[in-house]
Amino acid sequence: MKIDTKELLERLSTSRREFNATAFAELDRNLSDEEREEWNAIYASFSSRSLLRNTVIGLETIPFPTDENMEQALTCMVVMRHLVKVLIPLPLFWLEPTGINPNSVIGAEIDYIIIGVDREGECAVAARSLALEQQRWHALNVQHISEGDVISASVLACGPTRITVTACGFDVTMGQQAMSYTYLADMREEYHAGQQLQAKVLSVGEDMLALSVRDVGTDPYVHAELRHPVGSSRIATISSKYAGGVFCRLTDGCTVVCRYAQQFSDDQFRVGDKVVVQIRAFVDEKRWLRGKIRGKL
């Protein structure tokens, strides 16, 4: 049975009366300075809806009673600054539904707001969705982000061909072309959950944000024909192999799609090897070079 997000938020939230009736002074009497600081941040987030930021350290499934007197398994993201476990149920993690595997989010830096405090149980419940709503409102109505702005983005999850980042309260999924001028066969070799990036705003609306990490930098293909004339040789690093082509990266970031010289075979070369390539041609529509591998360093 699908759990209604609004109902879940209400049922997991600690009431103000219950919170104010808790004997925090007695419970916190023997805490260390670090423990006290951790709990004070949790209390403040609950009381004033201030944001907390920590790293997702794993997943946990907890029982959740339903109206039919049955228990349903509720999967939660887990964050922990020091000793207090904070559970974020998956329905309260996203603002919009996504197909992202929750395991891919482990290691990501996320913002959240505390909605429930179990002081005696040494844990708390939070909602990332509330933090996203707050950040989105601030970005649109206070910061007034617009097309062309460069903003900070945090990698939420990364797969071989798609990456999701969080910026200004939006979860934005992008393909390889929006990430790098250099061809990337597997983006997980360059990006990981929790990584901090800069991204350029391509368009923005009340419920959408389009970004490009690639456009923050300079396109290395511009004037590449002057730096790497046809017939010249250059050091390059093999970045991937695909359909008989060997994708190599020059020191300035240009991609060279190569063939091997006749004396070489494919099993002599691996991804990450440094090689000498000879520049053979320029492919403007792909914005890459063609070349031939002449040697291995």
Residue ranges and their predicted role:
Residues 1-297:
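Single-stranded RNA-binding regions, centering on S1/OB-family and related RNA-binding modules
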